[in-house]
């Protein structure tokens, strides 16, 4: 039961982590464009 619980937490954190990295990279990309302009 504990292994299944930890596995569920990992599966839940992976999409959140990927989404956070994507948003951070997107904001930095937009910020870079604004500085270039």
Swiss-Prot record:
Keywords of this entry: Chloroplast, Electron transport, Membrane, Photosynthesis, Plastid, Thylakoid, Transmembrane, Transmembrane helix, Transport
Gene: petG
SS bond list: none
Keyword Endoplasmic reticulum attached: no
Membrane topology: Single-pass membrane protein
Similarity section: Belongs to the PetG family.
Assembly and binders: The 4 large subunits of the cytochrome b6-f complex are cytochrome b6, subunit IV (17 kDa polypeptide, PetD), cytochrome f and the Rieske protein, while the 4 small subunits are PetG, PetL, PetM and PetN. The complex functions as a dimer.
Gene Ontology MF terms: electron transporter, transferring electrons within cytochrome b6/f complex of photosystem II activity
Annotated protein name in UniProt: Cytochrome b6-f complex subunit 5
GO CC, one annotated term: cytochrome b6f complex
Chain segments annotated as transmembrane: 5-25
Compartments (UniProt record): Plastid, Chloroplast thylakoid membrane
Source species: Spinacia oleracea (Spinach)
Domain of life: Eukaryota
SUPFAM superfamilies for the chain: PetG subunit of the cytochrome b6f complex
Pfam family membership, one: PetG
GO biological process terms on file: cytochrome complex assembly; photosynthesis
Predominant localisation class: plastid
InterPro entries tied to this protein: Cyt_6/f_cplx_su5, Cyt_6/f_cplx_su5_sf
Entry function: Component of the cytochrome b6-f complex, which mediates electron transfer between photosystem II (PSII) and photosystem I (PSI), cyclic electron flow around PSI, and state transitions. PetG is required for either the stability or assembly of the cytochrome b6-f complex.
């Amino acid at each position: 039961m504990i292994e299944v619980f930890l596995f569920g937490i990992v599966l839940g954190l992976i999409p959140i982590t990927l989404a956070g990295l994507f948003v951070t990279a997107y904001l930095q990309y937009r910020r870079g464009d604004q500085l270039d302009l």
